[in-house]
C-alpha cells in the first residue's frame, strides 16, 4: 500500500507493469533456474487417502492431528465471512460503544440501530473472534477488541478493504489479468490532483497512512541503532511520518526528507534539524550528505525496473561505510508468511505497480547495486514490517 500520508506516496509510483525488470534468481520465483517435476511425498499421499482419514479419526493420537487440520482448513474457508463480520463491527461502532460501558442486547440494539435478532448473530460471531465477550447478561469489550480500536490506523484500514475485496471478487479473472483493479486507481485518486474534488476522502486516507507509518517506524527503530548516525535521509518519505518518530528518539540528529516538491510544500517542518530535499527518485540523483538513508515502504510499491535503479542511486549517494535501511512487509520466501504472502502480496498485485519481495530477493538486488554486509535483524512483527540493513563498501 502507499507508504505515507500524502501525495508522495503515489507521485513516484505511476502505474507500470509489475515485474518489468529482470527477476532475481530466487527458488520458486519467476526467473529461477528450472527444476524438474518431483514425486508427491509420502505424508501428502497419506493425506490424499480418504480411507486413511477415516482410520485416523478413530485413533486416539492421530484424531487430534486430523481435527486440528480440519479446523485450520475451515478457518481458511470461512476467512471472508470473518473479515465481513469485522467490517460490520467497525461500521456499527460496536467496539467503541462497549469501550464506554457494557450493555445488554436490547440497549446495544438501540445504539447500533440493528434488530435484536440480527445483532445477536453479529455479537456471537464477534465473540467467536474474541473481540467481545458476554458476562452476566452484558456484552463487554474483550482485550482483543480493545487492542483493535487502539492500534493506529487499523480500524480505518478495515473500512478501506471493500476496495480490495471488489477486485478479488473474481479471483480467477484477477489472477489472469482480465480485470482492471479498482485499487490500482484508488490511491492515485486519493493523493493525486483529483483529490481536491473530495478533500474529506484525501484527509481521511492521509491520516490512515500517517497512523500506519508510525507503527512501522516504531518497529523499525526498535531494530536499528542510529546513535552513531551523522545524518539520516528518508527517500520517498512523503510528509515525514517516519522522520517525525526518528526526531523524537534522536532530537539532535540532522534529518533530510526527500520527496517531490509538491509533497514537501505541505510537509510540516517538525524539527529544527530537518531539511527538505525536493526531487524525484525516478528522474533525479539522490542528494549526498547523509550517512544513513532509509527506504520505508517504498520498494514494494514499485516494479523491479524502478527499484534496481533506485538502489543504485542510493548506493552512489552514500559515503563509504554508509548504511541503507529498508523497512517494509516482506514475503517469506522459502518459509511463506501468512500475512505477507497472502495479504500484502495480493494487495500489491491489485495496485498493479509493485510486488512483495523476500529478504533473499532484496539481498540479491542490494548486492547487484554494490552493497555489502547485508543483514536482516530478527523481525518483531512481520505483519507490520521487516528490516534489512546494508552497507556501502
UniProtKB/Swiss-Prot annotation:
InterPro entries xrefs: COMT-like, O_MeTrfase_dom, Plant_O-MeTrfase_dimerisation, SAM-dependent_MTases_sf, WH-like_DNA-bd_sf, WH_DNA-bd_sf
CDD domains to which the protein is assigned, alphabetical: AdoMet_MTases
Reactions catalysed: demethylspheroidene + S-adenosyl-L-methionine = spheroidene + S-adenosyl-L-homocysteine + H(+)
Region of interest (Disordered), residue spans: 1-36
Protein name, as recorded: Demethylspheroidene O-methyltransferase
Ligand binding (S-adenosyl-L-methionine): 259, 297
The gene coding this protein: crtF
Coiled coil: none
Biased composition (Low complexity): 26-36
Top-level enzyme category: transferase
GO biological process, one term: carotenoid biosynthetic process
Biological or metabolic pathway of the protein: Carotenoid biosynthesis; spheroidene biosynthesis
Keyword Methyltransferase included in the entry's annotation: yes
Record family assignment: Belongs to the class I-like SAM-binding methyltransferase superfamily. Cation-independent O-methyltransferase family.
Keywords: Carotenoid biosynthesis, Chlorophyll biosynthesis, Methyltransferase, Photosynthesis, S-adenosyl-L-methionine, Transferase
Function (record text): Methyltransferase that mediates the O-methylation of 1-hydroxy carotenoids. Converts hydroxyneurosporene to methoxyneurosporene or demethylspheroidene to spheroidene. Also able to produce spirilloxanthin.
Listed EC numbers: 2.1.1.210
Gene Ontology molecular functions: hydroxyneurosporene-O-methyltransferase activity; O-methyltransferase activity; protein dimerization activity
UniProt organism field: Rhodobacter capsulatus (strain ATCC BAA-309 / NBRC 16581 / SB1003)
Amino acid at each position: 500500500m502507499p507508504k505515507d500520508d500524502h501525495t508522495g506516496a503515489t507521485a513516484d509510483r505511476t502505474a507500470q507493469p509489475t515485474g518489468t525488470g529482470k527477476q532475481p534468481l530466487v527458488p520458486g520465483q519467476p526467473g529461477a533456474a528450472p527444476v524438474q517435476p518431483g514425486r508427491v511425498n509420502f505424508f501428502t499421499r497419506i493425506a490424499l487417502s480418504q480411507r486413511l482419514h477415516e482410520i485416523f479419526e478413530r485413533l486416539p493420537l492421530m484424531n487430534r492431528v486430523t481435527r486440528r487440520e480440519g479446523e485450520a482448513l475451515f478457518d481458511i474457508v470461512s476467512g471472508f465471512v470473518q473479515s465481513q463480520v469485522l467490517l460490520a463491527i467497525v461500521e456499527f461502532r460496536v467496539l467503541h460503544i462497549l469501550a464506554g460501558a457494557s450493555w445488554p442486547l436490547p440497549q446495544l440494539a438501540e445504539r447500533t440501530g440493528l434488530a435484536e435478532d440480527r445483532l445477536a448473530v453479529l455479537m456471537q460471531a464477534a465473540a467467536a473472534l474474541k473481540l467481545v465477550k458476554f458476562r452476566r447478561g452484558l456484552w463487554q469489550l474483550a482485550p482483543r477488541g480493545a487492542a483493535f480500536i487502539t492500534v493506529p490506523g487499523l480500524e480505518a484500514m478495515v473500512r478501506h478493504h471493500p476496495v480490495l475485496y471488489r477486485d478479488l471478487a473474481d479471483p480467477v479473472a484477477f489472477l489472469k489479468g482480465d480485470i482492471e483493479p479498482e485499487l490500482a486507481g484508488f490511491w492515485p485518486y486519493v493523493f493525486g490532483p483529483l483529490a481536491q474534488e473530495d478533500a474529506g476522502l484525501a484527509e481521511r486516507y492521509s491520516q490512515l497512512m500517517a497512523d500506519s507509518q508510525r507503527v512501522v517506524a516504531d518497529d523499525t527503530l526498535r531494530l536499528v541503532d542510529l546513535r552513531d548516525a551523522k545524518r539520516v535521509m528518508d527517500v520517498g518519505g512523503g510528509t515525514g511520518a517516519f522522520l517525525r518518530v526518528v526526531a523524537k528518539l534522536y532530537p539532535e540528529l540532522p534529518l533530510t526528507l526527500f520527496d517531490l516538491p509538491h509533497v514537501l510544500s505541505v510537509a510540516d517542518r517538525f524539527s529544527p534539524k530537518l531539511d527538505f530535499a525536493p526531487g524525484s527518485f525516478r528522474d533525479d540523483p539522490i542528494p549526498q550528505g547523509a550517512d544513513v538513508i532509509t527506504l520505508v515502504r517504498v520498494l514494494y510499491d514499485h516494479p523491479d525496473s524502478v527499484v534496481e535503479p533506485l538502489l543504485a542511486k542510493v548506493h552512489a549517494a552514500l559515503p563509504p561505510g554508509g548504511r541503507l535501511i529498508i523497512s517494509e512487509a516482506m514475503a517469506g520466501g522459502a518459509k511463506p508468511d501468512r500475512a505477507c504472502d497472502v495479504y500484502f502480496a495480493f494487495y500489491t498485485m491489485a495496485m498493479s505497480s509493485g510486488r512483495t519481495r523476500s529478504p533473499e530477493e532484496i539481498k540479491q538486488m542490494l548486492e547487484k547495486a554494490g552493497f555489502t554486509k547485508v543483514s536482516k535483524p530478527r523481525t518483531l512483527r512481520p505483519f507490520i514490517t521487516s528490516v534489512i540493513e546494508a552497507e556501502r563498501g
